Amino acid sequence: FMDIKRVISAVRGQADRVTVVMPLLYESRQHRRKGRESLDCALALQELQNLGVSTIVTFDVHDPNIQNAVPTSMSFENFYPTNTILKEFIKNEEFDPESVKFISPDTGAMDRAKYYANMFQADVGMFHKRRDYSKVVDGKNPIVAHNYLGGNLEGETAIVIDDMIASGTSMLEVAADLKERGARKVFLISTFSMFTNGLDGFNKAYEDGLFEKLYSTNLTYVDDNAIKTPWYKQIDCSNYASDIINTLNTSGSISELKNGKQKILTMLENKKNGEL
C-alpha cells in the first residue's frame, strides 16, 4: 500500500486525474468494528482520497458499504466478475439448470448467492456458523458447527458461493455437509482464492469426492500448484479489467460493463434446450 501511495505522489502533479485499480481491495475484510478493532479499510480509502485519487476500481469488495467512507470527491467503482465466471461454468459443466441450488456458506455471502440464484431462477440455501465465544484461536472465536438453513438437496447440484477463500476450511466443511445431505454434485465458486493453509485439504476433499471443481479468478495471485490441479478452474478476467480501464480512460459509460445479465440468461436458455 505504501508503494501505491509513493506512485500517486510521484505522478499526481502532472496527471489530469489518478485512477487506482486495486482488484483485491486493501484490508477489505477489516471493514467494520465489533470491539476495539481499527477501521483499516476506511482509513486507507480516505488516505487515497486525500492524495488526490479521483477513482478507485475494485472487484467483489467484501462489503460494498465501505464506499461510505469516501462519499464525496472520490468515485468508488466495484465490479463483479459474476457473469465472466458464469459463462465459463455454463459452457464447461454438465448440469440440469432445473436442479440447481446456490448455497451461501455464511450470512455474509447471502447477497452473492441470491444474485446467482436469481439468474438461474433457482433456490438458495445458507449455512449459519455457530461459534464458541469462550475461546479465541488465531484472533477469532472458533467455528464449532455449520447449521444448514434451506430446502432438500437430494439429487441436486449445489453451488457454494463466496467472495474469498482464505484457508478454505469452512468451504470444505460446507461441501462435506452438502454431500451428506444428498447433493449429487458440489461446485465451489470464489472470486479470490488465497489457500493460506496450502492445498492439502482441497486435494484430499477432491479425492474423497466432496466437490467437483473450484471456479476462481486471476484477480489476485494464485499458487501455480493450485492452477495445475484437476479441481481448480481459473477464470481469466484480464479482458474485463482492460475494458473497464479503457472505458474510464476515454470517459465512457461503465453501465454496460456492470450489466451482462442478458448474455447469461441466453446461455442458460440454450443449456435448458440442449443447445449448449
PLM ranges: what are they?
Residues F1-L276:
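PRPP-associated nucleotide enzymes
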